Amino acid sequence: MPAPALKMLAAAQRVLVAKGFSGLTLRAIAQESGENSAMVQYYFGNKEGLLKAMIDSVFRDDQEDAAAAMSTVTSDDRLPRFVDGLRTISSSRSFRVFFDVLPYALRNEGLRSRMARAYDWYRRIKLDWLRAEDQAPPSQKQGLLGLSELMTAVVDGLAIQEAIDDGFDTRRAYAVLEFMLQRSLPELLESDLHGGSRPG
C-alpha cells in the first residue's frame, strides 16, 4: 500500500478512537493526516472501503508482531509466552478499532465478513503460537481448535474490561489462565473432543 494510504489509515484509527464511528468522516481523516480529502476517496472509495482496509491493517499488524515475538521461543517458554502474547493482543490498538466498528459490522455484510476473516486469523495465530496444529494427531486437533476459540473469547472479554475501566489490571486474570493451562492442557490434548464430547 502506498505511503499516503498508510498515513491515512493511521490517521483514521486515531480519529476513530478519539471521536467514535460517527466522527470518522473523510474530512476528519484528511485533516488528521494532512492529506486532501479527495485522496482519501481515491485510495479507499468510501467509508466502508476505508473501514475494510483499517480492519485488515490493524489485525495484520497484530499478526505480524505476534509471529515475530513467538518465532524464537523455546518449548519450555512457549506457554508463558503464549499467555503473554494474549495479554499483549488484548491491550493492542486493534481492539479500540474493533469496539467502535463492531456494532456497525454486525449490520453490514461486507464488514461482518471482514471481521470474521480477522477472527480466523487470530485463531490461526494461537495455533501457530503453540506450534501444534501441524504436529498434532487428528485426535488432538479438535481440542486445539477449541482452545484457540476459547482463548479468543478470553482476550475479547478481558479487553472489554480493560477498555471500560482504567484501573483494571489484566495480569491477574492472565496469571490464572497460565496456571490453568499448565495443569489442564496435557489432559485436554489427550481427550477426544470430536463431536463435542467432553473430557471425563
Where are these regions (language model features)?
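Amphipathic alpha-helical packing segments from all-alpha helical-bundle domains
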Residues: 64, 68, 90-99, 109-135, ...
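Helix-turn-helix
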Residues: 7, 11-49, 53
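Residues in soluble alpha-helical coiled-coils and helical-bundle/repeat scaffolds
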Residues: 45-49, 70, 74, 106-110, ...
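Short, basic, alpha-helical segments at the C-terminal edge of helix-turn-helix-like DNA-binding modules
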Residues: 56-62
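Short helix-capping/turn signature of helix-turn-helix
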Residues: 41-44, 88, 100-107
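C-terminal peripheral helix-coil segments that are non-catalytic and often amphipathic
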Residues: 123-131, 154, 160, 164-200
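Hydrophobic alpha-helical connector segments
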Residues: 53, 64-95, 141-151, 174
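Solvent-exposed, amphipathic alpha-helical segments
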Residues: 11-18, 65, 97, 101, ...
